[in-house]
């Protein structure tokens, strides 16, 4: 008695910007061809990010791997052809063109854990670190450079030490009022 093959995770390259549509089309193709037994999840790994725009907190989604869709599947000729027949699919990543290699269980677990963490709390679009130098681009301290002393991601605010007349002055600013220096 042989064991049924295990579904493994494969990385499918899609046209950039069409990952969601490719995932949806793939799900529809699987149903249409009655191949549900060969496929598990079809994912476009994203995280919710928060950014300040015009003084407003805005939530948006950022893709972990732009241009890629993760597909849990049993690889055989039929499932391979089904994935390749979906519009805007460029191919599989890893292995050879006719025999793709799955990602390791360790890599798959790392991605799935990252997805779980991302669903818990939205992250800011821009990450700031204590000690980092930023430029103030709004308000009375516009065009001054300062050093980040504290970061409050909950409120999207920073405490920045700005040098005014040779003295370091702590200033509370919103994320949208500063920009990172390269």
UniProtKB/Swiss-Prot annotation:
GO cellular-component term (any): cytosol
Matching InterPro entries: KOW (IPR005824), NGN (IPR047050), NGN-like_dom (IPR006645), NGN_dom_sf (IPR036735), NusG-like (IPR043425), Rib_uL2_dom2 (IPR014722), Transcrpt_antiterm_NusG (IPR001062), Transcrpt_antiterm_NusG_bac_CS (IPR015869)
Keyword line: Transcription, Transcription antitermination, Transcription regulation, Transcription termination
Residue ranges annotated for the KOW domain, each copy included: 130-161
SUPFAM superfamilies membership: N-utilization substance G protein NusG, N-terminal domain, Translation proteins SH3-like domain
Pfam families the UniProt entry points to: KOW (PF00467), NusG (PF02357)
Listed GO biological process terms: DNA-templated transcription termination; regulation of DNA-templated transcription elongation; transcription antitermination; transcription elongation-coupled chromatin remodeling
HAMAP family membership: NusG
Protein family according to the UniProt entry: Belongs to the NusG family.
NCBIfam families for this protein: nusG (TIGR00922)
Function: Participates in transcription elongation, termination and antitermination.
Protein's name according to its UniProt entry: Transcription termination/antitermination protein NusG
The organism of origin for this protein: Vibrio vulnificus (strain CMCP6)
